[in-house]
């Protein structure tokens, strides 16, 4: 098929990884995929590695900026819009698909001005600034979590595209005649509060329920985190970054982590119970809303950072680790919330709009 698709996603892995999953599906269907990003985001590393043409526009966020930056903002946005319009004219896509990040605002408006169908996908339970603005004129609005956007004929609840290897057909039985296995995830850039909290909390557990521990600390935090575990007499494997997440998830019985949208979707895919500590300063507190998706169904416990010290974490760990059937029930519930067809569903929506 001689047709181009322009994907817009940038900044963080939470936007880029779901978009990459869809890019691969577009390619499998014969489309040529182009990517619109910004010079500062993770896309500059990942998209060339994926062999996709990357087009860049210069745009940054405005929240928390000083007065001078706000005064310059209209000129920055106008320049970014002109750059995005040039890319749209060059690529001539049958549709433009936005997955979030600063790039999607100018890119989405450029699609509208060019008369190209625009589809947006929101990964979080609370829509980002750009997607809220674009939703009013997008051809379709895809959401990972139900009711992120107001009900409309163009809304589709699709789930988050995640790597297919993460899906387990049936969650395995936790604590099957062995020690429990605890996976701690601080995010690819780490989460220092978790790096400090978990060693102290685990040190308070009775010896007979001490789990095996695999802790992702984030870049440059592995040595000091490993030292914290040694200082309190807890054995743990600490790594700055976990390359094979499918293997890590299949190993674990319980996960302690933040509540980014992609993490929530991966926990469901892998059928894993979790203790979720939402990032307290996330924009619009979207991580708390993400966490509620699993917690209200009984697949996770939410533990706000402000009220969770070592004693509180130790008490919760003790509760769940001493009740294997509760862990297994949480695992089954998590798996029931997974959307294994999310990637296909999003791409189907795009193809329908492009050729409908």
UniProtKB/Swiss-Prot annotation:
Annotated pathway: Cell wall biogenesis; peptidoglycan biosynthesis
Catalytic activity: di-trans,octa-cis-undecaprenyl diphospho-N-acetyl-alpha-D-muramoyl-L-alanyl-D-glutamyl-meso-2,6-diaminopimeloyl-D-alanyl-D-alanine + UDP-N-acetyl-alpha-D-glucosamine = di-trans,octa-cis-undecaprenyl diphospho-[N-acetyl-alpha-D-glucosaminyl-(1->4)]-N-acetyl-alpha-D-muramoyl-L-alanyl-D-glutamyl-meso-2,6-diaminopimeloyl-D-alanyl-D-alanine + UDP + H(+)
Keywords from the named record: Cell cycle, Cell division, Cell inner membrane, Cell membrane, Cell shape, Cell wall biogenesis/degradation, Glycosyltransferase, Membrane, Peptidoglycan synthesis, Transferase
Domain of life, per lineage: Bacteria
Localization (cell): Cell inner membrane
Top-tier EC class: transferase
Residues engaged in binding UDP-N-acetyl-alpha-D-glucosamine: 12-14, 124, 163, 188, 242, 287
Keyword Transcription applies: no
Record EC number: 2.4.1.227
InterPro entries: GlcNAc_MurG, Glyco_trans_28_C, GlycoTrans_28_N
Segments traversing the membrane: none
GO cellular component term of the entry, any: plasma membrane
Membrane disposition: Peripheral membrane protein
GO molecular function list: UDP-N-acetyl-D-glucosamine:N-acetylmuramoyl-L-alanyl-D-glutamyl-meso-2,6-diaminopimelyl-D-alanyl-D-alanine-diphosphoundecaprenol 4-beta-N-acetylglucosaminlytransferase activity; undecaprenyldiphospho-muramoylpentapeptide beta-N-acetylglucosaminyltransferase activity
GO process terms (BP): carbohydrate metabolic process; cell division; cell wall organization; lipid glycosylation; peptidoglycan biosynthetic process; regulation of cell shape
Function: Cell wall formation. Catalyzes the transfer of a GlcNAc subunit on undecaprenyl-pyrophosphoryl-MurNAc-pentapeptide (lipid intermediate I) to form undecaprenyl-pyrophosphoryl-MurNAc-(pentapeptide)GlcNAc (lipid intermediate II).
Protein family: Belongs to the glycosyltransferase 28 family. MurG subfamily.
Annotated protein name in UniProt: UDP-N-acetylglucosamine--N-acetylmuramyl-(pentapeptide) pyrophosphoryl-undecaprenol N-acetylglucosamine transferase
Originating species: Pseudomonas syringae pv. tomato (strain ATCC BAA-871 / DC3000)
Lineage of producing organism: Bacteria, Pseudomonadati, Pseudomonadota, Gammaproteobacteria, Pseudomonadales
């Amino acid at each position: 098929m001689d047709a181009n698709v322009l994907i817009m996603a940038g900044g963080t892995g939470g936007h880029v990884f779901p978009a990459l999953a869809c890019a691969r599906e577009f390619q499998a269907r014969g489309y040529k995929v182009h990517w619109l990003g910004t010079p500062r985001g993770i896309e500059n590393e990942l998209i060339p590695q994926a062999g996709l043409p990357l087009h860049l526009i210069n745009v940054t966020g405005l929240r928390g900026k000083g007065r001078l930056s706000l005064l310059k903002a209209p000129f920055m946005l106008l320049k970014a819009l002109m750059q995005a319009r040039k890319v749209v004219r060059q690529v001539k896509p049958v549709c433009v698909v936005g997955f979030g990040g600063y790039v999607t605002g100018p890119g989405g408006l450029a699609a509208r001005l060019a008369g190209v169908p625009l589809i947006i996908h929101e990964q979080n339970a609370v829509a980002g600034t750009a997607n809220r603005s674009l939703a009013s004129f997008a051809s379709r609005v895809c959401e990972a979590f139900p009711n992120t956007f107001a009900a409309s004929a163009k809304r589709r609840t699709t789930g988050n595209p995640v790597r297919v290897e993460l899906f387990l057909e049936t969650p395995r039985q936790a604590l099957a005649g062995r020690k429990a296995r605890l996976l701690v995830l601080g995010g690819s850039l780490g989460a220092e509060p978790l790096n400090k909290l978990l060693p102290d909390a685990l040190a308070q557990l009775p010896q007979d329920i001490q789990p095996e521990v695999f802790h992702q600390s984030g870049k440059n935090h592995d040595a000091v985190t490993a030292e914290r575990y040694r200082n309190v007499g807890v054995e743990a494997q600490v790594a700055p970054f976990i390359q094979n997440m499918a293997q890590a998830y299949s190993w674990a019985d319980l996960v302690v982590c933040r509540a980014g949208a992609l993490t929530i979707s991966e926990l469901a895919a892998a059928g894993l119970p979790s203790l979720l500590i939402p990032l307290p300063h996330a924009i619009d507190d979207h991580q708390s809303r993400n966490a509620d998706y699993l917690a209200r169904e009984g697949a996770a416990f939410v533990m706000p950072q402000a009220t969770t010290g070592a004693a509180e974490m130790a008490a919760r760990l003790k509760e769940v680790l001493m009740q294997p059937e509760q862990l297994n029930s949480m695992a089954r519930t998590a798996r029931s919330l997974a959307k294994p067809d999310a990637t296909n569903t999003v791409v189907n929506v795009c193809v329908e709009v492009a050729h409908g």
